[in-house]
Amino acid sequence: NIPRDRFYGQIDVEIPEPIRIERGAGGEQSLDEAADLLASAEFPVLLAGGGVVMGDAVAETIELAERLGCPVVNSYLHNDSFPASHPQWCGPLGYQGSKAAMKLIARADVVLALGTRLGPFGTLPQHDMDYWPADARIIQVDADAKMLGLVKKISVGICGDAGATAKALTARLADRTLACDATRDERAATTAGEKADWEAELDDWTHEIDDFSIDMIKEAIDEEGNWLHPRQ
């Protein structure tokens, strides 16, 4: 136990100025291999993780995703890694995640895991779906080399900053013809369809439709002095 008065008082300290640490995109060979793999993909999926957020790299991720025209899913607890307003966004994987995201990544032949450790909460089965694409080629990008290939078998590992890596890959793919270019519209329609189906299912979860619940809601609404809606 520490006496409370020990936590009070004044001391002389020097607060250091913040420094900016240069973070690179990863090795040239790894970037070239990743670009080749993405160029050959028929149904690529981009998995955006916490590294995108911490690296302030959402804009770079959007640019890369739009070049690929691919579905984008969020890693567990990192819904802010890609904007939900974007048509290619599909929602989070894993625990209490989006069925649309899981169904789409299950179809992937190449997954670009950008700034994510691929932890178990975002890769294990959910909604009775074992959705992780066992046969897909995985490109994992993480600033910590110890995370590369730790959880999932990968084809290419890139130790680099998520934003710098996304920018480098976009530059490598900018003038190339991609295998998935021919199916861009078809894949966009598939993405939109899966999202619409998931939204419809969520609507059924949101509103009570059974007779008992409807009667209880009506009874509560009509109760005098009850100002709180039953659903709240």
Task: Specify the residue positions occupied by each region the protein language model found.
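An N-terminal, well-structured beta->alpha segment
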Residues: 18-32, 214-217
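Anionic-ligand anchoring segments at beta-strand to alpha-helix junctions in alpha/beta enzyme folds, i.e.
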Residues: 26, 33-111, 230-232
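Aromatic-enriched
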Residues: 4-26, 180-187, 198, 205-206
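Short internal beta-strands
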Residues: 1, 69-76, 139-142
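Short, solvent-exposed amphipathic alpha-helical segments in soluble enzyme
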Residues: 14-16, 56-69, 126-131, 156-157, ...
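Active-site diphosphate/adenylate-binding microenvironment
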Residues: 189-232
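Glycine-rich beta-alpha junction loops
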Residues: 1-7, 50-52, 145
